[in-house]
Curated annotation (Swiss-Prot):
Protein name: Lipoyl synthase
Cofactors (names): [4Fe-4S] cluster
Source organism of the structure: Escherichia coli (strain K12)
HAMAP family (UniProt xref): Lipoyl_synth (MF_00206)
Annotated family: Belongs to the radical SAM superfamily. Lipoyl synthase family.
Primary residence: cytoplasm
GO molecular function: 4 iron, 4 sulfur cluster binding; lipoate synthase activity; metal ion binding; protein homodimerization activity
Cofactor note: Binds 2 [4Fe-4S] clusters per subunit. One cluster is coordinated with 3 cysteines and an exchangeable S-adenosyl-L-methionine.
Subunit structure and binding partners: Monomer or homodimer.
Subcellular localization, as worded in the UniProt entry: Cytoplasm
GO biological process, one term: lipoate biosynthetic process
Keywords, ordered alphabetically: 4Fe-4S, Cytoplasm, Iron, Iron-sulfur, Metal-binding, S-adenosyl-L-methionine, Transferase
Amino acid sequence: MSKPIVMERGVKYRDADKMALIPVKNVATEREALLRKPEWMKIKLPADSTRIQGIKAAMRKNGLHSVCEEASCPNLAECFNHGTATFMILGAICTRRCPFCDVAHGRPVAPDANEPVKLAQTIADMALRYVVITSVDRDDLRDGGAQHFADCITAIREKSPQIKIETLVPDFRGRMDRALDILTATPPDVFNHNLENVPRIYRQVRPGADYNWSLKLLERFKEAHPEIPTKSGLMVGLGETNEEIIEVMRDLRRHGVTMLTLGQYLQPSRHHLPVQRYVSPDEFDEMKAEALAMGFTHAACGPFVRSSYHADLQAKGMEVK
């Protein structure tokens, strides 16, 4: 498929086609240049995939999406097999084109007005007690999708009054005031927004995003709801140093964030940003110790940790790595 000149609405652009649209060019990694995964990065697949197929079927039946599938998460088999999933609202096409992410880029269609009801019913049918709701970036919407988040939260709580809801939100670039007015009126139980990496390489990792803007989003939500935990996550292995990661942790604490996730970046395809290093489990343990010493109440740090990986256990302060 050649580089599209005009993107067609509703078409998913992935891998080389997606990367061709990024202003900061990324050269595809030659296979012989790929870093070999260390032993600690090997995943054991479950012997029985019945539960996995059941969750996928429930998603398809209601026209829902999971970030687990759309972003090719390495923990999909484990989480689905335990009956948990992170739901991705507002469609499966992102208006951003971050070169670390496997979610498709393009011109998305209008949000499904029935999605909040379908999502709430699916969650009730699955009898979930803790759910994570995330979304693609929707720079095409005046509120960045904030009202859709609020509608989903309201619908879920109507069907499942005892449930705990964590939202993993985009940065609402250029729409922070409007988005926060909506989100603070219908708050989740945990408010999550990922910084992803360090300021020095932000333009390469998150083109179109701004490090300080993301910190401000987290801070302003916390100011509006001091009683609600705020959370953020980073990937390691993109060219940053451990010292830079620790400095980002300090920035997060200065902006009121109390929950942290650190995990290893994995290259979705050779067209995405390459893995520069694999961080050892011992290094993750050291960074967790630093985080707790800084005052984070929860810190999940490990090779396979993702922002929503065992989020229910993270919220309880249980060991996740």
